């Protein structure tokens, strides 16, 4: 299982790295908005103990995080890569717990994974006067 997960993450990351060579902030914002909506959906799925939908939500988050990871990698921002990778590993744990029907534990693991997202936001996100956000490269 760990080997399959590792191969899947590497494959997603390699494809995302090729894409991320462009500087498309709008697409990055799209991933962030998608992540927020998908995490909300995942929390609802976990509360409802809906494993199939929860698995789909986790996969979507992992796909987005592969793109986020590639975005930071292409800009040589190692802590951004690390934050995304830690969140991805956390989501893998969530997925395992969902497979075991341990929905409460999965919800707790999701909170831990989200902490990686929050840490990245603290380091790499500035709020503009108009309420929008800008990325800081440090």
Where do the model's predicted regions map?
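Positively charged n-region of N-terminal signal peptides that target proteins for export
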Residues: 1-4
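Short, solvent-exposed, charged loop/turn and helix-capping segments
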Residues: 64-83
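Immediate post-signal-peptide N-terminus of mature secreted/exported proteins
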Residues: 20-57
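Bacterial N-terminal signal peptides
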Residues: 6-16
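Short, charged, amphipathic alpha-helical segments
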Residues: 55-60, 81-85, 107-112
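The canonical Cys-X-X-Cys-His
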Residues: 113-124
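Flexible linker/context regions in extracytoplasmic redox proteins
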Residues: 25, 29-32, 36, 122-138
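Amphipathic, charged alpha-helical scaffolds that flank and support histidine-based chemistry
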Residues: 44-55, 91-111
